[in-house]
Design a protein with these regions (language model features):
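C-terminal transmembrane helical hairpin of 12-TM major facilitator-type secondary transporters
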Residues: 299-342
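Helix-loop junctions at membrane interfaces in 12-TM secondary transporters
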Residues: 7-11, 90-102, 318-332
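C-terminal ends and interior cores of transmembrane alpha-helices
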Residues: 80-94, 289, 307-322
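A membrane-interface helix-boundary motif in multi-pass transporters
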Residues: 159-174, 256-269, 383-401
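Juxtamembrane intracellular "pre-TM" segments in multi-pass secondary transporters
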Residues: 1-8, 188-227, 258
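Loop-to-transmembrane helix entry
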Residues: 39-50, 132-142, 167-170, 251-278
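Helix-loop junctions on the cytosolic side of multi-pass membrane transporters
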Residues: 165, 172-200, 409-413
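Substrate-agnostic recognition of the 12-TM MFS/MFS-like secondary transporter fold
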Residues: 13-32, 47-66, 70-82, 97, ...
Length: 413
């Protein structure tokens, strides 16, 4: 199917949103930030789980709020929660404040996920470009990955000159405050058809949205679809930051930039690798639509990438175990690429399967499932990393998810 949407002002706003959203300068160094504070992997896993479980608990009600009372306000509240989180991370002096910051970050995620995707699809519906979902979402998502690539270089410079991981949270405030202003400029048509009208009471609006949600999820098939779509993304969210200690080991062993101290050398090498990762994932996301068109239906590539990604996780652990670190790093990069090819397909598949009227809620439920899976596997990864080793934590968690795939693989309608 040829690309036929117009790159208008709103298209560029969506792209700019994705770019600014991923100016998370802490992303390439978050786990190293925690390790520098002498936390165990189990404690780190708990922080990730707090963030994910907060997102899980709040996911469905925030989706309902977005569908029923307005998506722009929901997004603005989300960004405000992120700002609070960054400030607390910056000033955190003990584990309790790290938990508070993780909670605030989880609140921000809960109010954001699903909502912005629904705004994009609302715009496609308004423009009669509904058949362009994979292409359009893939294009806008690719700008998120470009943002991450630029962010990784800026983060490396910040750590290089400051010598402190903490400062990256302070600098992250700048793009997020700009993002707040951008969201406020979105047109009202993106609020969705479920927004409360003057003649309707708030109770009536919520009842209507909730009724449609329960109607969509009253059978096991719908739940199976959500589990299948969210499984690999949840796994990815839990395992992706473990690339950082792997890269730290790689940077220490690499005989380059030896005139610099370890932290400066690690900052430059990790920043450069993450730049390459996000450049590749931006291409993967952008061409997700073309990849999907090679198959007769979306469920085939969704199932295939799920299995390939989990096998890649097992192999990454095995190569790290045998100290072939460069291959382990390359395989980790493969997991990032698989996620960014699969994610636009998953979102498009959900939008084709469920009613447009409750799309924000459906996507929030799917994102909630991601968060629950990520919370569980973050704890498992941390636990096994402490009692056995990091490499075996990769192997065990990937294997657990792989052997259970027959339970939730997508089937023909």
């Amino acid at each position: 199917m040829p690309v036929r949407f117009k790159k208008d002002i709103q298209y560029y706003k969506f792209c700019l949103y994705g770019f600014l959203k991923n100016q998370r300068f802490f992303d390439p160094f978050l786990m190293l930030f925690f390790l520098e504070k002498n936390l165990s992997y189990t404690q780190i896993g708990l922080l990730y789980s707090v963030k994910m479980l907060t997102r899980t608990i709040l996911e469905i009600p925030t989706g309902v709020i977005a569908d029923a009372l307005g998506r722009r306000g929901t997004m603005i509240f989300s960004y405000s929660s992120y700002v609070v989180s960054f400030i607390v991370y910056y000033f955190s002096g003990n584990y309790f404040f790290l938990i508070v910051a993780s909670f605030a970050f989880g609140v921000g995620d809960a109010f954001r996920t699903g909502t912005h995707k629904a705004m994009i699809f609302e715009y496609l519906k308004y423009k009669s470009w509904e058949d362009q979902k994979v292409h359009y979402y893939g294009h806008t998502r690719s700008w998120s990955q470009v943002g991450s690539a630029v962010s990784s270089l800026i983060a490396a410079v910040i750590v290089f000159y400051s010598g402190r991981y903490t400062d990256i949270f302070l600098f992250t405030l700048i793009p997020y405050l700009i993002g707040l202003a951008l969201l406020a400029s979105y047109p009202k048509i993106l609020e969705g058809s479920g927004v409360k009208k003057p003649e309707q009471s708030v109770t009536d609006v919520f009842k209507k949205v909730l009724h449609e949600i329960f109607s969509s999820f009253k059978n096991l098939k719908s739940l199976k679809i959500i589990t299948s779509l969210s499984s690999f993304s949840g796994y990815y969210m839990a395992i992706k930051d473990y690339l950082q200690p792997v890269l730290q080991t790689f940077a220490t062993a690499l005989p380059v930039l030896l005139f610099l101290d370890n932290k400066k050398r690690e900052a430059l090498i990790i920043g450069a690798v993450y730049f390459i990762i996000y450049f590749l994932t931006s291409r993967a996301s952008k061409y997700s639509g073309r990849s999907a068109e090679k198959f007769s239906s979306l469920l085939k590539p969704l199932n295939l990438i799920l299995v390939m990604g989990l096998v890649t996780g097992i192999l990454a652990g095995l190569f790290y175990k045998f100290n072939i670190i460069i291959v382990s790093v390359i395989l980790f990069i493969g997991i990032y690429i698989f996620e960014n090819i699969r994610r636009p397909m998953a979102v498009a598949y959900a939008s084709e399967t469920f009613s447009d009227r409750i799309l924000a809620s459906v996507l929030s439920i799917e994102s909630q499932a991601q968060s629950l899976i990520a919370a569980l596997f973050a704890l498992l990864l941390g636990f096994f990393a402490d009692i056995v080793s990091i490499e075996f934590s990769f192997i065990i968690t990937s294997l657990v998810l792989l052997v259970t795939t027959p339970l939730y693989m997508l089937k023909n309608k």
